[in-house]
């Protein structure tokens, strides 16, 4: 936001602080000032001149001019501009002058003719092309007729102004206007604000007799139109052009410039239509139809869908609501009747449309961040009066509108003790009340309780904490005392904090590196690996990519895998421990659940001269989980073919003591392609379940004093039977001495029946006191094989 210091002083007449002092004060009061610049910076010796005579140089486009610059003698200056004429007031760069790009003007000869200066166009004195009302080929700039010859040009073009560049955060969009900035400065210094006023005179003829307004979407709370007839389109007066250029806006014509001026002053976007081009006496505001097309002011045809808001006349779109007008109804030099629009458009809808079409405008950015809902009518009336003032014509009586929307002003209460407790201060009742009055709040004091009625221009204030922040800002952050927090309790880690440290150690011992991802992601990524789920979305996100609280952490890890692999780091092993956010049926605030997730990709062992590379696979990822869950009594890996975004044949749901705790597996190839990454394996675990199911203590057992016994069994089974099923049946045989079951061979193919596979297991029996006899070993193995045959229809080979 570019704030003109001259304009600001008009709105806060008693302001005595310099721009440098203002920069420091605003920065320490909550609104960052990026810097203060002046349009005249780096320029010198630029004066008003008047062309006394002009003579063409034969066979060229050049002219020999004699220019009065207020000196005893006129200056001879050679100029090639096509619009040079006698009597014209111009910008003269004298010999020795500095113009744009630090170029120094020297005495010279052009086509053998001596030239003692330069007649300048606006771009030649540093006016950026984006805000320059003239094209370079149009020629030199003509100064106002009342400009005094010999005077410096800077005051006539307001180039002696100082521009304060504000960096406005989304929560302080109220400062995206001159009025908002004035209220802020007035509050900081305790000065009254004097906003601009204009008296609107209406004609006797009613606007409602010529036009009607209808709104068929709930995304437009109010839509207002004023009709102005008999206008004459022309250039705006120089003061208005100057003010717009200093605000970073390009002057167009008197009508369009008024709408832009009001946008900068009030923060209220307006749009002006050529009413004669409507071909209808009704404006209909609705959602666009899929496939509907319109050509916007930038003369680009755009195909719309039902998420876009359109303003239509005669059944056709004449504006992309809140974003840009249509080319078919734009103001031209022939326009005589103007339909002036002021409305409230849904910010989320505007943001989506703006991003979809890459149309970022001053209007759309303000609708996205929020505008003062209480001054829509005031801004419309001000603009109508100003158009008549500059372009003539008459304002038809009455505002034609969809409904007379008025915002409800919230009331927020706080006590003096709460303010002082939060800030560590000892402020008096009078001091805090004065601060609220300076902010323009309506204040009622009852005992030590303040009840503040918040004006519509401060839509960011809703709760007690907001009032505390306002007091801190205006009182001055630098004036707050430095205090240390006091506590009666000794510090101690919680059970979850201790558990996180244990888990972190386990993951890092498996070769994984910790990363920290964003809690805010896109709505799509928030639920990508967990299916359909209600999510929590910010009302005013900083960016579209950071608007929804994540319901899982894996998309963030995949983004990091992509980042590394794009930089030739193919082997990635990372994990994150953090919170995910799940819907809370009893509260608008989500439930925070501690989770861990990891992602691995590439090789476990790289290829070398004496061995092949060993890539990561499902079993490697599963092994990391098994190591992590080694202390748990019962851990199951159940095959899953319907886990969102995961490979249906290489994914397992993880259960701890019968409770679902997470999943592990390969991401679906389509998901990997979307993230532009190689084959990647991931896991996600609920740390709350892990902590709750963690054994209370580890029971010590003596090291066995007798030798373990090993027996191998080979099984012919259906191909669909899993290793987990087999291990579960073996353990269900309840052989007390069975200490380990290990799969050491799998075969499927030649010499085996179709649909069958062979799996070989090593069984380890560990007696505690006495060595097992052959009969005991045989009985144990037979019990296991019998159980396998009965429950899984297995053939013992």
Curated annotation (Swiss-Prot):
Top EC class, one word: ligase
Domain FDX-ACB as annotated: residue spans: 704-797
Residue stretches making up the tRNA-binding domain: 40-154
Catalytic activity, reaction form: tRNA(Phe) + L-phenylalanine + ATP = L-phenylalanyl-tRNA(Phe) + AMP + diphosphate + H(+)
PROSITE patterns on file: B5, FDX_ACB, TRBD
One CC-aspect GO term: phenylalanine-tRNA ligase complex
GO biological process per UniProt: phenylalanyl-tRNA aminoacylation
Binding note for cofactor: Binds 2 magnesium ions per tetramer.
Lineage: Bacteria, Bacillati, Bacillota, Bacilli, Lactobacillales
Cofactor (UniProt): Mg(2+)
Main location: cytoplasm
Keyword Metal-binding part of the UniProt annotation: yes
Assigned protein family: Belongs to the phenylalanyl-tRNA synthetase beta subunit family. Type 1 subfamily.
Gene Ontology MF terms: ATP binding; catalytic activity, acting on a protein; magnesium ion binding; phenylalanine-tRNA ligase activity; transferase activity; tRNA binding
HAMAP family assigned: Phe_tRNA_synth_beta1
Domain B5 stretches: 407-482
Compartment(s) of residence: Cytoplasm
Record protein name field: Phenylalanine--tRNA ligase beta subunit
Alphabetized UniProt keyword annotations: Aminoacyl-tRNA synthetase, ATP-binding, Cytoplasm, Ligase, Magnesium, Metal-binding, Nucleotide-binding, Protein biosynthesis, RNA-binding, tRNA-binding
Self-association and partners: Tetramer of two alpha and two beta subunits.
